[in-house]
Regions:
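Structural detector for internal amphipathic alpha-helices that build alpha-solenoid repeat scaffolds
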Residues: 2-13, 33-47, 66-85, 103-118, ...
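Amphipathic alpha-helical scaffolding segments comprising HEAT/armadillo-like alpha-solenoid repeats
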Residues: 11-26, 47-63, 84-98, 118-133, ...
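Detector for Asparagine
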Residues: 27, 61-64, 96, 106, ...
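Charged, low-complexity interaction regions
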Residues: 29-31
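Terminal, low-structured helical/coil segments at or just beyond the last alpha-helical repeat
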Residues: 225-251
Length: 251
């Protein structure tokens, strides 16, 4: 057997070993100690394929929620520790993994929160949101997680990206987008889009949230041609002043 044959066989053996460990790790019916051993062994392997195998654990839920949380925490800690290896691009592998996922991204995002700085996380969330449309999705979990995380990442670039989701067909996404935009508080950017959303919105909690924001910003005036529409949707505790601003009625 030549050297190249030996190296090829060694590489194939490693691939088979990682596949076997991944199969154990993602089998929710084996004993927890077996899955823990698989996590430890994959961590020690320290290869890109081992990182991908560990990420697969985030895709399944163990029947016991305590065990499930403990194992996912262990995987999270293992991935963070593996990132210390300068020859192992844990960040890049997880980022590519997230690009192809439509659900269960919370734990991989949690790992990246430890590995990326603030601006890098903003750029990542912006990139991932760009691939999310505002149309109907059977499972909007990824979009919802990203919009939710956006609230804690104040950035005009991210606020601009979030504006699309004011028109999302999913009410929860619209509500979270409003919350995030108000938390970012780029007033000149959000005033007109929020006013338009207020005119069209049917969800009471979203109308309430936007009306509260307008009442807190009396400099946000409603154009005369839009006042009739706005008055028609305002909850009873709000009113529209003749000067065009929304205010809260006194009890």
């Amino acid at each position: 057997m030549g050297l190249l044959d030996f190296l090829f066989d060694k590489e194939q053996a490693q691939v088979r070993r990682i596949q076997k460990l991944k199969k154990t790790l993602t089998n929710m019916y084996v004993q927890p100690p077996e899955r823990k051993y698989a996590i430890q062994t994959l961590r020690d392997e320290g290869t890109p394929d081992a990182v991908r195998a560990l990420l697969a654990r985030f895709e399944d839920n163990a029947p016991n929620t305590t065990v499930d949380g403990d194992e996912k925490t262990y995987v999270y800690e293992s991935l963070v520790s593996m990132s210390a290896d300068p020859d192992l691009d844990v960040r890049g592998i997880i980022t590519n993994y997230l690009r192809g996922r439509e659900e269960k991204i919370n734990w991989p995002m949690k790992v990246l929160t430890d590995l990326l700085d603030y601006q890098e996380m903003i750029s990542l969330v912006c990139e991932l949101l760009e691939s999310c449309g505002a149309d109907y999705q059977r499972n909007p979990e990824k979009k919802q997680e990203l919009v939710l995380r956006s609230a804690d990442l104040r950035s005009e670039e991210l606020s601009t990206e979030l504006l699309r989701f004011l028109d999302d067909l999913n009410e929860t996404i619209r509500f979270l987008a409003v919350e995030a935009l108000l938390k970012h508080d780029f007033k000149d950017l959000i005033e007109a889009p929020l006013r338009e959303r207020l005119r069209e919105e049917e969800s009471l909690r979203i109308v309430q949230k936007i009306a509260d924001a307008f009442a807190a910003n009396p400099e946000w005036k409603i154009p005369e041609e839009e006042r009739e529409d706005i008055e028609a949707v305002l909850p009873n505790e709000f009113a529209l002043h003749t000067e065009g601003y929304i205010y809260q009625r006194h009890a």
